[in-house]
Structure formats: C-alpha cells, structure tokens
Amino acid sequence: MIKVYGMPSCPDCAEVAKKIKAIGRESEFEIINIGEHVAYLKAFLQLRDREEAFRPVREGGYVGIPCFVREDGTVTLDPAEFGL
C-alpha cells in the first residue's frame, strides 16, 4: 500500500484524495492526515528531514505535501507517478 502524507486543508492534498476516490483506487493508498495526530506529524517530519526527495522542498521553505511513500520505502512528491 502506498502511504500519502498530507492534510485536508492543503489544496494539492485534497485534490489527490479526491482523485484517488474518483478513480476507485482507495485500496491502493493509505492517506495519512499529518494534522490529525502528533505521531503522524512526527513520522512525516522524520521522513522529510532525511529523504533526498525533499531537499528542494526544505531549501525552498515548503512543507512537502502531498508526499507518497511506496511499499519499497522510496519517496516521491509527484502524484503523476501514480496516475493522479
């Protein structure tokens, strides 16, 4: 299952969640709302701090959501890689 870190208040995250539902692929994705619980936020921040995919995000002062973590642990910020 692909993990999607995001927040409903983020327009890009909301659009990704909407597309996942619209194309009936909910069983392929676990959407994790980082604003729902501090444990989710901590997990995302640890990922954001260590993954190379976030370097431009960190340098630009951005949050980096939505973020996708594949089953093999690789990270991308590009929803198009999943047809979204």
Regions found by a protein language model. Name each.
Residues R50-G61:
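Short, internal strand/loop/helix patches
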Residues V16-K19, Y40-A43, D78:
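Amphipathic alpha-helical interface surfaces
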Residues V63-L84:
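Non-catalytic, surface beta->alpha helical segment in thiol-disulfide oxidoreductase systems
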Residues M1-N33:
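Local sequence-structure signature of Cys/Sec-based thiol-disulfide redox active-site neighborhoods
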